[in-house]
Amino acid sequence: MPVNRTIRAQSPGEFRLMSYGVNAYSKVSAAKEVPPRELEAILLMKGAAKLEAVKREWETKKDLTEALAYNRKLWTILVSSVTDETNPLPQNVKRDFSNLAIFVLQSLISLAAEPAVDKVNCVIDINSQIAAGLRA
């Protein structure tokens, strides 16, 4: 049986914090309705889109650092998930994905040290191809 409670904010700032909490919960609840493979595909495409945006502003390299950080974090999480011992994927798939993740992460590090459009294109292509495979 649900418990009804009235929560009163002691200050306007506290009310905003409660609102942020409700909004965050709503976003997480909505995300739970997306199948995991589709969510991974969406996140990979978001990473590709961030890098595409950098390409459009290549002369200034606007948002390069943020795009690289997003993709590094994403690939770190993906490889951690895939290689987890509780993941039911076959060992050869885990190994192959790990090798791909190492390549992508090295490409991102190289891109941070020496920015080049061909390196950006490589990561965009990999993100897009993996996303397409997840959606197939």
Regions of interest found by a model, annotated:
Residues 2-77, 83-84, 90, 94-136:
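N-terminal intrinsically disordered, cationic/polar leader segments
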